[in-house]
C-alpha cells in the first residue's frame, strides 16, 4: 500500500477499504507502532491553542487553586509539544466577569476550551458560540449534559451524594435530624449541588429509618454573616448530622468548635483543603469526601492533547475517584 493510504489510516481518514484498513491496523499492532509526537507537534505548532475558563481562587475556599495547580502541571507538560494554553478567570459570584472572560477568549483563536460551567445559561450561550466557530469544548467540575462537544471530566455528583448518605447511615440513628446545608454566596449558580442532594436523599430514603431531613441555604461567604445563621439553625433544628454540600465545611466546623455551649453534631463535607483538614484532624469533622480537583484540569488538558495530537476518539465522561478521609487516614492522602 502507499504511504498516503497508511497516513489515512493513522489519522482515521476516509477513502480506505475496510479490508486494507484492518490489515494496516494489524501490522501497527504487531510492530507496536508509536507515532513520533515531537515530529507531529511540528506540524501543528503555532496553530494549536487551548483555553481554560475557571473561577479565580478566593479567600473562603482554595478549591479552585487546586484545580489551577493541575492545569499548571498540564501547561508545563504539554507546552513542550508546541501547544499554547491560556487561562481566563472569572468571579463565580458575578456573571458579568464570565461574560468578559469569554469575550476576551473569543477575540483570539483557540482549538478547544475547558470550561467550569458555574453560570449555566451563560455557559450554554458560550458553548453555542464556540460550536459556531468550530471550537471544541469540554466541561470540568460539573456537567451540563448534552452541551459540550468533548464530554465531561469531574465527579459523579449523584454518586458523591449517595456516598455522603452512606456515611450518614453510620453516624445517625433512626429518626435522626439531618441538616443538609448549602453555604455560598450566589447559590442560584450552584445548581449542581441539587444533584448531590438528590443522591443523598435517595440513599437515606431507601434505608427507611425515618430520618428528618432539612435543606437550608446560607447565601454568604463571610464567617461574620454565616455565624448568626448557623446559630439560628442550630437552635431551630438541633441537628444530629450536618451534611455540607460543598467545600465550605470548615466554616461550619469552626462554628461548632467555637460555640461549646451548643450540642456538636456529626459533620460531613467535601474536599482536601487545609482549612477542612485542620478541623478533620481536631475531630470536628467526621468525614471529608474528596473529588481530586487538581486531576480534573490536568486530565482535561490531557484529553485535548490525546485528541488533537494522538488522534484518539472524543466524547468522554471521565468520573473522578471518590475518596473518603477521616481523622485516622488523612495524613497519608495526596491530592
Q: Model features per residue range: what roles?
A:
Residues 122-159, 273-281:
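Flexible loop/hinge segments that line or gate small-molecule binding clefts
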Residues 1-46:
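N-terminal helix-turn-helix DNA-binding module of bacterial transcription factors
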Residues 77-81, 133, 204-211, 258-263:
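Short helix-capping segments at alpha-helix termini
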Residues 27, 31, 188-189, 204, ...:
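Hinge/cleft segment of the Venus flytrap/periplasmic-binding protein
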Residues 36-96:
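Amphipathic helical "hinge" segments at domain boundaries
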Residues 112-131, 216-275:
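Hydrophobic alpha-helical
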Residues 56-63, 87-97, 154-162, 182-205, ...:
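Hinge/beta->alpha junction and helix N-cap segments in small-molecule ligand-binding domains
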